[in-house]
């Protein structure tokens, strides 16, 4: 997991061949004027979703993990808390959904952190994460889904 400010996101471009394109979008798109839904990306290894999501409390938040995608999650309208747990410590998997590349787990995160507007959280497949935690009823956010090195389309 990596957290940082959007202004510093360029520091991480060397970690993955598609991070440069994702970070360029992160730093240049006018998210306030984009409608909710999927945003078209030229790079076939990146999908971007913008939406308003219901928030929950920590007790209701259960970790999720992905196998084939890296998430960059960006709160656009407020503070979002994230639970984190190393994938090796996840317990009680509730079944992997291959089509959505997601599995939820019935266990507790080991760490919590707050991400504010102007910041992002980057989650690799090794990172179990429990997003959408906070005191507001809803949050508007952007989520980048970037294919892992093993599953990406060649350029």
Walk through the language-model features, giving the residues of each.
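Conserved short histidine dyad/triad with adjacent acidic residue
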Residues: 48-66, 76-90
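A gly/proline- and charged-residue-enriched helix-loop-helix capping module
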Residues: 105-110, 115
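A short beta-loop-beta micro-motif enriched in histidine and acidic residues
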Residues: 43, 59-71, 88-92, 97, ...
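Short, conserved beta-strand element in jelly-roll/cupin
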Residues: 68-80, 95-101, 145-146
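A short, N-terminal "cap"/entry segment at the start of jelly-roll beta-barrel domains
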Residues: 1-49, 60-65
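A short hydrophobic beta-strand segment most commonly corresponding to one strand
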Residues: 72, 120-122, 137-153
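Structural motif
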Residues: 45, 69, 79, 119-120, ...
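Conserved metal-binding segment of the jelly-roll/cupin
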Residues: 113-128, 132
